[in-house]
Amino acid sequence: MLASKLDPFLKRFEELNSLLSSSDILNDISKMTTLSKEQKNLEPIVLKTKEYLKTLDNIEENKALLNDPELGELAKEELKTLEELKPKLEEEIKILLLPKDLNDERNIFLEIRAGTGGDEASLFVGDLVKAYARYAENRGYKLEIVSSSEGSVGGFKEIIMLVKGTGAYSRLKYEGGTHRVQRVPQTESQGRVHTSAITVAVMPEVDDIEIEINPNDLKVDVMRSSGHGGQSVNTTDSAVRITHIPTGIVVVNQDGKSQHKNKESAMKVLKARLYEMQENERLAKESEARKSQVGSGDRSERIRTYNFPQNRISDHRINLTLYRLDAIMQDGLFDEIIEPLITHHQAQALQEQNL
């Protein structure tokens, strides 16, 4: 029975309340921070549990009043409302009981690269960057460009952005993979539709303590920053290239105003890539049955098609098709795709957990 599964959460929450009011904990900042975080994480399930248990009590109380000559009719109406509320609360609680993705609340690095399609792919990277910027603004996230390489006719060959905001990873993690675009290039005189592709990688920003890097494993090169077309934009060696020798991962950063700033940003991206590599290795070891059917987030997995002539956007992971591509791109309305993906992921997880 669901109610019996919830009792440990209530007991632990009360225990935390007691601990956090004790003088021993109040004098230990580290311990207090850890316990406060646990309490905050438990609060949603505890509040929903209390609402659910109160609903169960109210159902029993109203059942007992059904034969009452004065209150029976009122109890019948109230019982109908409560019986409709009960399964909704149960579903909400089951979702809260699902194992949490530890990365969900993190900031993210969003890395977008032009793939097949040459200039057209670079232009679409630029369009997607603008759309993601509007999405970030809609959700109250802050977005900053970490590094970029412009395309020869506009857009970007590649770009890395840092998206800051609570829950950024929980939503944008669904963007990882290959995005295919079909549209008529401006240079196409006969109106033929061209197909190009770009890749998106979503990497959680990680703390220094989570990823330890041996300085001896790094090769750091400094060089002149270059602007569009290779033009030198300053007279100091401020651009930084860091190579992680064991993995061969290379990160270049030249967008900052100083060598120190560029090195700092490059190290953050390197740590995110190493963390992503570790996570992918961990996921690969899990059984296929436990992998979410929403997709792995692997940048080689084709997840979505943007068809401009048809004003169509299709997400292949859940067979979702919407004919409002223009509005989604113009206003950054990616939640119209992300919300169904989250719902699908939760349904799969509930099935796996037998909840």
From Swiss-Prot:
This is Peptide chain release factor 1. Keywords: Cytoplasm, Methylation, Protein biosynthesis. Its main location: cytoplasm. Methylated by PrmC. Methylation increases the termination efficiency of RF1. PROSITE patterns: RF_PROK_I. The keyword Protein biosynthesis applies. Residues 281-302 are annotated as: Disordered.
